[in-house]
């Protein structure tokens, strides 16, 4: 018997309610203004760094990807880096600028191609927000014309690297506890779930099978904490319908005729996606129903585009 669950808050409203008490605890008695002086922007020939009293984040000037995240209290490195990198689309950095704004350190990256802009904002309390605007123009400019997305979209979003060896588990709010595919979402229910890391390969694992499988796509993210003895962090969704991809499941080595049982996963290790692929069963995807088919993107002048907004807590 499956008990259905339904969300009663949009992701951005839920996030607002979650952050208010945390920010109040971080700055009691109106001490926010005092902390603001500790937030600043630093530049070298190759890097732009956003620094607060709690967290320091450095970006490459060449492509606006994260090169390092440091927790200032203990100097610990959080190895989420080498992103955001486009998945299912193309984007090329056109302009990069940094500034102070209302006490926050802000980095604004503008792109040609499928992405319009990604704005990073580091608040004095150490929370880092990412606001991405995607697919809001019919022409990507700079020779892209409209050829800046995959013809058939399997995965669409942004991806980062994070070493699998650092992760011991995940606690998250969203659909769970099982991983999903585009045509395997019903049955995964909203809730707060916990999974310890495992590398279960159904049909092949010789050791004890541990379920739910840890790696894969997770639907309707509200927040997730990647647990680690050395480098934990939490990410919150401020946009609805985001899929969280966690690492890449291994294919069974003894699969029939060596054929892959799963569609290709995005590059990187941790991805935030607006679309994911279906998984086939006996028949090719082209012979499955409409909910299994790859996405097709059509953009018209005046479209608002898609938003992929996140908040990272590295403290």
Please identify what each model-predicted range represents.
Residues 1-29:
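Short beta-strand elements
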Residues 20-315:
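Beta-strand/loop-rich accessory regions of lumenal/periplasmic or secreted enzymes
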């Amino acid at each position: 018997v499956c008990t259905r669950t339904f969300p009663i808050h949009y992701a951005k409203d839920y996030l607002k309610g979650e952050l208010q008490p945390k920010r109040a605890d971080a700055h009691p008695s109106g001490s926010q203004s005092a902390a603001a002086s500790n937030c600043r922007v630093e530049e070298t020939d190759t890097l732009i760094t956003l620094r607060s009293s709690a967290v320091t984040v450095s970006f490459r000037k060449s492509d606006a990807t994260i090169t390092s995240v440091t927790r200032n209290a203990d100097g610990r490195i959080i190895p989420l880096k080498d992103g955001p990198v486009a998945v299912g689309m193309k984007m090329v950095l056109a302009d990069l600028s940094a500034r102070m704004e209302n006490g926050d350190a802000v980095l604004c990256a503008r792109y040609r191609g499928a992405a319009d802009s990604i704005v990073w904002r580091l608040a004095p309390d150490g929370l880092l927000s990412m606001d991405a605007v995607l697919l809001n123009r019919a022409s990507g400019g700079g020779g892209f014309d409209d050829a800046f997305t995959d013809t058939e979209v399997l995965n669409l979003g942004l991806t980062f690297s994070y070493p699998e060896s650092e992760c011991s588990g995940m606690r998250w709010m969203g659909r769970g506890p099982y991983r999903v595919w585009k045509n395997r979402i019903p049955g995964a229910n909203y809730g707060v779930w916990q999974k310890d890391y495992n590398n279960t390969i159904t049909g092949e694992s010789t050791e004890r099978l541990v379920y739910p499988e840890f790696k894969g796509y997770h639907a309707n993210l509200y927040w997730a904490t990647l647990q680690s003895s050395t480098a934990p962090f939490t990410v919150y969704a401020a946009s609805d319908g985001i899929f969280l991809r966690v690492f890449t499941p291994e294919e069974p080595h003894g699969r029939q005729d060596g054929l892959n049982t799963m569609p290709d996963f995005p590059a990187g290790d941790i991805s935030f996606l607006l679309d994911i692929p279906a998984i086939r069963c006996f028949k090719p995807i082209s012979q499955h129903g409409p909910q299994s088919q790859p996405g097709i993107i059509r953009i018209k002048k005046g479209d608002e585009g898609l938003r992929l907004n996140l908040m990272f807590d590295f403290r």
